[in-house]
């Protein structure tokens, strides 16, 4: 594990000169919004081709890059990444409910300019944005002070107009360095990169692991009990479970789709074997907040409630059991990876107080590292900040190279990463 305090352009070039190669890049660069007047958030480095060209050179062929950005200027970073040779594979979304709309009240501004009096119609208790935390970064809401603010109403024709929407997502570019070999298989065999770790990022759900609570399943328990005297579902056995599958009309003889067989025309339903490993990972993640869950109104509580806040709703392959479940699974937010916002204890889980304003949840970064990094691989984060990616990589058993220019944040990152205990493998434990 290598932690470097220095300029990322200079330090990445040194790593290239030393022949270093990494398996993945998972990073949260400056959003170039001039956030809170911080100089490091207005340098333009996230939009520079040179930044991503160096990352490109450090990556093995087929290696993936995951980089966060802001919704309003994501395109500039994505274009810079693509222009240096990366293939844009997808755009992921991190949804959260803690965003605060930085919108001007146009009606109020009009009344102030014209000297109109506004009528106080009530009071509200809201977060004090002057407390210095960035609401759109999923930090613990308990850290915000709250103040009473009067609700006023004016007579301007522009009453109710504003200038901005409530921020509720951060896009993540998923890019891949082109393969050096003719196929994915050959590239993986040679470099260990090029593929995505689907099974280790599957999302638990009723359709496979809890067929007894899923209305789409046949009554396997009753049928098995009648046949062999044992209710298989009572033991959580799902090898005979079936899920409902819509049968689509096939193409015509020439293999051409028509209005009559477009795939939207269903002939009926059949029952297919359920996948016990869980749902296929999607390009949406969320913080599990009520605001986000309300977007998916079909959320229905399941019969089992585990410690989902620690697992992120991920299927635990090593035990064959869910790592924890807090949602049902009927067309709801449960279909997507979730982890709670960065808590105060997580921010300050070392001997150094963490005052970095844009801390990502460690579990979110673990999920991303796990998705694109092969076993024993090296993760690079050239915008290390307070070290969440480093903590995630270490916790997942990956090696890590982190670069951070700001001395203050570098010391915080060192302490936070040091606080993560390395999990011993079974072989190491036996030895």
Task: Report each predicted region and the residues it spans.
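Core catalytic lobe of class I
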Residues: 1-431
């Amino acid at each position: 594990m290598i932690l470097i305090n220095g300029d990322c352009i200079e330090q990445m070039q040194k790593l290239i000169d030393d022949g270093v190669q990494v398996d993945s890049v998972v990073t949260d660069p400056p959003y170039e919004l001039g956030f809170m007047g911080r100089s490091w958030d207005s340098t333009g480095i996230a939009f520079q081709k040179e930044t991503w060209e160096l990352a490109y050179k450090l990556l093995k062929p087929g290696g993936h890059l995951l980089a966060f950005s802001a919704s309003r200027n994501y395109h500039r970073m994505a274009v810079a990444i693509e222009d240096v040779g990366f293939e844009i594979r997808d755009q992921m979304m991190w949804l959260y409910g803690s965003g605060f709309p930085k919108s001007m009240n146009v009606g109020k501004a009009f009344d102030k300019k014209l000297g109109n009096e506004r009528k106080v119609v009530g009071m509200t208790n809201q977060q004090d944005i002057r407390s210095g935390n960035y609401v759109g970064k999923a930090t613990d809401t308990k850290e915000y002070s709250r103040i009473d603010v009067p609700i006023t109403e004016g007579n301007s024709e522009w009453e109710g107009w504003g200038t901005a929407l409530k921020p509720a997502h951060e896009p993540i570019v998923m890019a891949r360095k082109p393969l050096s070999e003719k196929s994915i298989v050959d590239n993986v065999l040679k470099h260990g990169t090029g593929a995505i770790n689907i099974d280790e990022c599957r999302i638990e759900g009723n359709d496979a692991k809890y067929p007894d609570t899923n209305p789409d399943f046949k009554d396997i328990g009753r049928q098995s009990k009648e046949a062999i005297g044992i209710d298989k579902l009572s033991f959580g056995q799902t090898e005979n479970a079936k899920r409902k599958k819509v049968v689509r009309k096939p193409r015509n003889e020439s293999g051409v789709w028509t209005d009559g067989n477009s795939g939207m025309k269903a002939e009926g339903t059949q029952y297919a074997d359920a996948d016990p490993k869980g749902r296929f990972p999607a390009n949406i993640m969320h913080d599990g907040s009520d605001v986000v869950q309300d977007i998916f109104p079909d959320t229905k509580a399941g019969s089992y409630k585990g410690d989902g806040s620690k697992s992120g709703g991920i299927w635990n392959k090593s035990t064959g059991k869910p790592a924890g479940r807090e949602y049902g699974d009927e067309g709801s937010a449960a279909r997507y990876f979730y982890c709670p916002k960065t808590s105060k204890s997580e921010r300050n889980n070392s001997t150094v107080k963490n005052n970095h304003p844009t801390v990502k949840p460690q579990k979110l970064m673990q999920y991303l590292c796990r998705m694109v990094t092969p076993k024993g691989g090296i993760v690079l984060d050239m915008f290390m900040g307070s070290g969440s990616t480093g903590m995630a990589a270490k916790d997942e058993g990956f090696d890590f190279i982190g670069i951070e220019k700001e001395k203050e944040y570098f010391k915080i990152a060192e302490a936070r990463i040091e606080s993560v205990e390395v999990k011993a493998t079974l072989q190491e434990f036996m030895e």
